[in-house]
Amino acid sequence: MYPRQAWRAIKAGMPDDVIISSDIGNNCAIGNAYQTFEKPRKYLAPGLFGPCGYGFPSILGAKIGCPDVPVIGFAGDGAFGISMNEMSSCAREEWPAITMVIFRNYQWGAEKRNTTLWFNNNFIGTELDPE
């Protein structure tokens, strides 16, 4: 399934009061074009500085602040790898349920795309080992 298809399918099933957060990277940037909100403070965006690993901790904070509101986070496998240690935080006590969508393509996709564009398909260090 392509990221656009995943975003559309998930968006179709989202409740109106959901809080979402996306990380940085190609998969999440695609989704930014599909979200619409009727109320403020429903989208936690990483901003322009590229804080890789932002998506997961931000929905944890949103769930603590609004425990009765559903939260959904989106990240690529590389970005999630940076923040997955936060899983130990939410496992320490009884936490309300969250949803985290992880797009798996086994690469630092944005970096790979940029290096292939700028350096004539010469890239290194952008592949993630699926093992």
Feature annotation, model-predicted:
Residues 1-42, 46, 84:
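Cofactor-pocket helix-loop regions in the catalytic cores of large enzyme subunits
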Residues 30-131:
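Thiamine diphosphate
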